[in-house]
Each structure stands twice: as structure tokens, then as C-alpha cells.
């Protein structure tokens, strides 16, 4: 995996927080960029997992292997809004493909449909989102607050989201691999 230059930032890229991002929701976060333009950017934090149970009336999981459904804090903006990332190509008519085999769709009705669904479909329900005004993300990138990495379905739906930050840095190699070993609490170093 090669670090990407800022000029290649686009939908489907991963923003990996620098160790300099200290504290707050973006500390050690990995953000999937869902939209990027001159007007601004929006993405979803993938590795801030929430341990919650949604009532069956809100989100029916009977057609899913519950181990393939995760809840996370997508970002600090509009935390009451739920964004849905999934691997179900059959719902692509109501979804946007963010990167190969990863779709963003806000309509939960397909979750209850059996047809075309396999128990291997993976889902990530993100509460809230992350957003930047035009030029803001570029400024943060130039200040060294973010690294850019390519994404994949395997990274986004990893079985070990708590290790995603260090795993992505390891895959970037070089100095990034050594950054991945920095303890979260430097007093423990």
C-alpha cells in the first residue's frame, strides 16, 4: 500500500489521522471519504465502534448474520442521522458506490428484503458524519493532521476495527509503519 498525495484525494480514499491529532473523535481515526469537491468534503469515521442494539422495528436484522453488522460513530455532525455503508450490489439503485463493492445508501428498506441478499453482506451503520468546508481539509492535510491511503472492502469491513488505524499505517510502510506502534497514551511509552 502506498501513501497517496493530497492531489489524489477523492471519493473512496481513506483519511488516516496523524498521531498529532490528539484527543477528540478524530484521534486515531480512519475516515472513508464519501464526497470531495472544491465546495467541501464529507466522510465517515470507520473505527469508532458503538456498542448498541437497535429495536427490530427500526432496523430488521433477521436476514443478516449479526456478526456482519457494526455500528460506529461516523463523525461529530448530525449524530442523530444514520448513514449506511454496505456490500450489497443489489441495492445499488438506491446507493452510491464509494469504492469497489462498497456502497453508501440511506434507505434502510432494502435491509428487510430477502431477495438478492446473501448472509455474507456486510453493513456498517454510522451515526453522524464528518464534514469539511472547501479548503479546510486541504489545510489540515498540509498541516500534517491527515495521511491519505487507498481503501478497500477488506479494510472498511475489517473484523478488527479497533486495529484499523495501526493496520492501515502498517500497510503504508516506511515511517508510517513506525508511527503505527506509538502508544495511545505516551505516558505508557
Curated annotation (Swiss-Prot):
Per the record, the domain of life is Bacteria
One GO cellular component term? cytosol
Q: Which Pfam families match?
A: DUF179
How far does the signal peptide extend, from start to end residue?
A: none
Q: Check the record and name the HAMAP family matching this protein.
A: UPF0301
| Family, per entry | Belongs to the UPF0301 (AlgH) family.
Tell me the protein's name: UPF0301 protein CTA_0231
- Which Gene3D superfamilies does the UniProt entry name for this protein? VC0467-like
Record's InterPro entries?
A: AlgH-like
Amino acid at each position: 500500500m502506498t501513501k497517496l498525495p493530497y492531489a489524489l484525494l477523492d471519493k473512496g480514499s481513506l483519511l488516516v489521522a496523524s498521531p498529532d491529532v490528539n484527543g477528540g473523535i478524530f484521534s486515531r481515526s480512519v475516515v472513508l471519504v464519501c464526497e470531495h469537491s472544491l465546495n467541501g468534503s464529507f466522510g465517515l469515521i470507520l473505527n469508532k465502534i458503538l456498542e448498541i442494539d437497535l429495536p427490530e422495528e427500526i432496523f430488521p436484522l433477521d436476514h443478516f448474520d449479526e456478526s456482519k453488522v457494526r455500528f460506529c460513530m461516523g463523525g461529530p455532525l448530525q449524530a442523530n442521522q444514520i448513514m449506511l455503508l454496505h456490500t450489497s450490489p443489489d441495492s445499488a439503485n438506491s446507493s452510491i458506490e464509494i469504492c469497489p463493492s462498497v456502497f453508501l445508501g440511506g434507505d434502510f428498506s432494502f435491509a428487510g428484503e430477502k431477495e438478492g441478499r446473501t448472509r455474507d453482506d456486510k453493513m456498517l451503520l454510522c451515526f453522524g458524519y464528518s464534514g469539511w468546508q472547501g479548503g479546510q481539509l486541504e489545510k489540515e492535510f498540509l498541516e500534517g493532521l491527515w495521511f491519505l491511503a487507498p481503501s478497500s472492502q477488506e479494510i472498511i469491513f475489517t473484523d478488527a476495527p479497533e486495529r484499523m488505524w495501526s493496520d492501515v499505517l502498517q500497510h503504508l510502510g516506511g515511517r508510517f509503519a513506525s508511527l503505527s506502534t506509538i502508544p495511545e497514551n505516551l505516558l505508557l511509552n
